Amino acid sequence: KVHIVHLSASEGIERIKNRKKSTDKLTVETCPHYLYFNAEEIPDAAPIYKCAPPIREKQNNRLLWDYLLNDGFNFLGSDHSPAPPERKQLESGDFFKAWGGIAGLQFTLPVLWTAGKKRGLDLEKLLSLLTEKPAKFLGLEHRKGELKEGFDADICVFNEEEEFTVVKNCIEHKHKATPYIDQTLKGKIIHTFVNGVQVVKDSKLKELNAGKLLLKK
């Protein structure tokens, strides 16, 4: 099996399509920052946007969305990669020394819904790409990915219409350096339950370490 992580270059899409015609052993995903940002609308060499592979141009972004809307991606990942502000070189502006990664796990669903709704993405399809499909890929479909009797009680209460602007004091992960600051997003996570334990209440983290190591069985 071959899995392609974090596809950002649309040039790879046709090759992947052609290969998928002859095998079911090839899977591919992409990440929110490649679908939300584009090179024309971010500052040149700004360390806060540094990631690998890099964020690309608008036309590339459009082609990634076309592929997603036509059921090309097997699922979506977060590629959450936080770092202390000093490692992102926010003060020095040194792009080459900066940590290559974007922190955004908390905003994965709102970011994708904000960008996706404008393009006609159905919320049910988006949720499947973030839950059911990755669970199946990981061999966890017997306990994860659906609201079903006997499954783990992993539940997210999501207000798809509520808008909010990302500010530092609403960020729940330790390191606050993220390019999503000052972005206005549509759709807000209100409550989250992990294994039946409420870990987010009224959009605030209230419980740590409720998760468990997940192993394919």
Regions found by a protein language model. Give the residues of each.
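Flexible loop/turn segments at secondary-structure boundaries
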Residues: 11-13, 35-37, 83-86, 164, ...
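Short Gly/Pro-enriched turn/cap motifs at secondary-structure boundaries
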Residues: 54-55, 147, 180-184
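Residue-level signal for inorganic ion chemistry
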Residues: 2, 29, 79, 112, ...
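Histidine/acidic residue-rich metal-binding segments in metalloenzymes
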Residues: 1-76
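Conserved active-site and cofactor/substrate-binding residues in soluble primary-metabolism enzymes
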Residues: 7-11, 59-63, 100-107, 121, ...
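Predominant activation on well-ordered alpha-helical scaffold segments within soluble catalytic domains
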Residues: 13-17, 36, 65, 69, ...
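His/Asp/Glu-enriched, well-ordered alpha-helical/loop segment
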Residues: 70, 74-75, 82-162
